[in-house]
């Protein structure tokens, strides 16, 4: 039905794919994420700093190339539009925070609260349902109120949800927090995406849509890597500072690699020692979840500030 009801627009001046730009962007992403993971795993060593600096350098080369070739992979001219910049930044920060916290939340439900995979999935179902509800309501809201107001309110509500998750622990804190987060973030991925596409010239709408999708995927991957690195540092610090008498240094190092490793190691130790290790590991992972939740709250508040500043004069979107 798509070809019959969806009119297609083709850019008559579309150029060829620049393979060098593809390779540069891929190298920049991989080097940066590798550097972040090495930084969390081994500290500020030669490998981590070299990878991060190399990733930044390759990223700079990529951006420089985009400004000098006829058919860039990333059209920097799109960023001249303030609504485009604001919506894309909010989109990126929201995805970064959401994916970064979610990776900890699923482990927390199973390895700290002891839920089965099915129970953990059911515990996250309210978040998903509220996200769907918020997405379905967003077009009606956007037809009545300015997009900036909806996005700022949604991002502020999401920040409150992240903060609630960072303040408490247990299932009865987590589920209400994720409900608020889902309702608040939904407009960012619906209204925000529409602003990204409609802010671009018609001949660049495809490029804007592709950039929106790419930013979402990249921000999600970066959120997992960045928040995972921060959370791992918090978890290890809590585990190292815990009183665990008689636990060998190599066992403590293995437990510090991941919560799953600590749970597995606890099963091989004497009962009293395994219980102490498991309690310390679960407390440390709870600290890590709360730290990443607060980081997520800060990020979405920054996104709300950007939207409030750059989208002040944008009217309500047309209905439909």
PLM feature segments, named:
Residues 1-90, 97, 115, 123:
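Hydrophobic transmembrane-helix bundles of small-molecule transporters
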Residues 20, 47, 68-203:
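Transmembrane core module of solute transporters
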Residues 30, 136-140, 191, 221, ...:
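Residue-level hotspots within transmembrane alpha-helices of multi-pass secondary transporters
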Residues 36, 109-110, 141-142, 230-235:
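Interfacial helix-cap and linker-helix signal at transmembrane-aqueous boundaries
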Residues 59, 159-160, 300-304:
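Small-residue-rich packing faces within the transmembrane alpha-helices of Major Facilitator Superfamily
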Residues 120, 150, 208, 292-293:
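Alpha-helical transmembrane segments of multi-pass secondary-active solute transporters
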Residues 194-195, 215-309, 320:
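Hydrophobic transmembrane architecture of multi-pass small-molecule transporters
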Residues 204-211:
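Cytoplasmic loop-to-transmembrane helix junctions
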């Amino acid at each position: 039905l798509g070809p019959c009801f969806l009119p297609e627009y083709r850019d008559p001046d579309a150029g060829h794919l620049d393979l060098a730009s593809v390779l540069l962007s891929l190298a920049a992403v991989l080097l940066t994420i590798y550097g972040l993971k090495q930084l969390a795993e081994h500290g500020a060593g030669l490998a981590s700093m070299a990878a991060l600096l190399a990733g930044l350098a390759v990223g700079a080369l990529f951006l420089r190339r985009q400004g000098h070739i006829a058919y860039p992979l990333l059209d920097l001219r799109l960023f001249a539009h303030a609504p485009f910049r604001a919506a894309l930044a909010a989109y990126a920060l929201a995805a970064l925070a959401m994916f970064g916290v979610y990776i900890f939340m699923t482990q927390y439900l199973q390895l700290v609260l002891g839920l089965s995979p099915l129970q953990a999935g059911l515990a996250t179902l309210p978040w998903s349902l509220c996200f769907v509800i918020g997405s379905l309501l967003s077009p009606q809201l956007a037809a009545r109120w300015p997009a900036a107001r909806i996005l700022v309110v949604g991002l502020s509500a999401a920040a409150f949800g992240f903060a609630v998750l960072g303040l408490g622990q247990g299932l009865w804190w987590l589920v209400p927090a994720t409900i608020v987060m889902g309702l608040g973030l939904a407009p960012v991925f619906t209204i925000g995406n529409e602003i990204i596409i409609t802010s671009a010239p018609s001949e660049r709408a495809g490029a804007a849509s592709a950039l929106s999708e790419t930013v979402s995927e990249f921000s999600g991957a970066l959120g997992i890597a960045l928040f995972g690195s921060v959370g791992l540092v918090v978890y290890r610090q809590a585990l190292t500072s815990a009183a665990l008498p008689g636990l060998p240094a190599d066992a403590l190092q293995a437990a510090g690699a991941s919560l799953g490793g600590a749970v597995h190691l606890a099963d091989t130790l004497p009962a009293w020692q395994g219980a102490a290790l498991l309690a310390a590991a679960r407390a440390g992972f709870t600290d890590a979840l709360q730290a990443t939740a607060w980081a997520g709250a800060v990020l979405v508040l920054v996104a709300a500030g950007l939207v409030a500043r750059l989208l002040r004069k944008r009217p309500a979107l047309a209905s439909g």
